[in-house]
């Protein structure tokens, strides 16, 4: 039996009465938000608008992005990453469960020293994929060129944010590389593993 989105009590400062709001709205007010699904245009636009709104509201208080995602659309994920770099407050990233593919790219985009993984979290990096098998020959060539540019960008970001040499990152991106929380820390994708 689905329970829907739970409601929780919330009292605004200066108000006497408590109102019931859905749990996500309550957490947003505390600057906490979640990527708990596949990354697509809709979820990336929601995360981007939240980050921008909250940074306008108060630009000195950190934002917290909790991640449990199998990945998704590369360009949508890159838009979330770019926004994290653009907004003034630090964005702390917390991996709980899985940060795979473009979700690991978002994870590594958190403020340096403020990227965390829960002890049993998993992180997976790999090269961006495409739908070559569906394309005509001319489209295939154009798409391959674009995919190479995207791969170079993603590789460059991982190198910059992890401190690993380009050859290590390039080699790791050749296949699906799964890491435990401590392995992700050693790889420079997260800075801390939360203690139990």
UniProtKB/Swiss-Prot annotation:
Compartments (UniProt record): Plastid, Chloroplast stroma
An example Gene Ontology biological process: protein quality control for misfolded or incompletely synthesized proteins
Assigned EC number: 3.4.21.92
Highest rank taxon of the organism: Eukaryota
Gene Ontology annotations for the cellular component aspect, listed alphabetically: chloroplast stroma; endopeptidase Clp complex
Active site: 101, 126
Entry-linked CDD domains: S14_ClpP_2 (cd07017)
InterPro entries xref list: ClpP, ClpP/crotonase-like_dom_sf, ClpP/TepA, ClpP_His_AS
GO molecular function, one term: ATP-dependent peptidase activity
Catalysed reaction equations from the record: Hydrolysis of proteins to small peptides in the presence of ATP and magnesium. alpha-casein is the usual test substrate. In the absence of ATP, only oligopeptides shorter than five residues are hydrolyzed (such as succinyl-Leu-Tyr-|-NHMec, and Leu-Tyr-Leu-|-Tyr-Trp, in which cleavage of the -Tyr-|-Leu- and -Tyr-|-Trp bonds also occurs)
UniProt keyword terms in alphabetical order: Chloroplast, Hydrolase, Plastid, Protease, Serine protease
HAMAP family: ClpP (MF_00444)
Record-stated family: Belongs to the peptidase S14 family.
PANTHER family documented for this protein: ATP-DEPENDENT CLP PROTEASE PROTEOLYTIC SUBUNIT, CHLOROPLASTIC ATP-DEPENDENT CLP PROTEASE PROTEOLYTIC SUBUNIT 1
Binding partners and assembly: Component of the chloroplastic Clp protease core complex.
Its job: Cleaves peptides in various proteins in a process that requires ATP hydrolysis. Has a chymotrypsin-like activity. Plays a major role in the degradation of misfolded proteins.
Protein name in the entry: ATP-dependent Clp protease proteolytic subunit
Organism: Nasturtium officinale (Watercress)
Organism placement in taxonomy: Eukaryota, Viridiplantae, Streptophyta, Embryophyta, Tracheophyta
């Amino acid at each position: 039996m689905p329970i829907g989105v739970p409601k929780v009590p919330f009292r605004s400062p200066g108000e006497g009465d408590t109102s019931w709001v859905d749990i996500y709205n309550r957490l947003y007010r505390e600057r906490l938000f979640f990527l708990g699904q596949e990354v697509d245009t809709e979820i990336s636009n929601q995360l981007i608008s939240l980050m921008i709104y909250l940074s306008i509201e108060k630009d000195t208080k950190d934002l917290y992005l909790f991640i449990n995602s199998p990945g998704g659309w590369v360009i949508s994920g890159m838009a979330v990453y770019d926004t994290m770099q653009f907004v003034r407050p630090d964005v702390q990233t917390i991996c709980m469960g899985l940060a795979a593919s473009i979700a690991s790219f978002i994870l590594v985009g958190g403020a340096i020293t403020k990227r965390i993984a829960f002890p049993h979290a998993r992180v997976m990096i790999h090269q961006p994929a495409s739908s070559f098998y569906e394309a005509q020959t001319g489209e295939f060539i154009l798409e391959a060129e674009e995919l190479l540019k995207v791969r170079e960008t993603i590789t460059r970001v991982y190198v910059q944010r992890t401190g690993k040499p380009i050859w290590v990152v390039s080699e790791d991106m050749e296949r699906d590389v799964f890491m435990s929380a401590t392995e992700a820390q050693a790889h420079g994708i997260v800075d801390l593993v939360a203690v139990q």
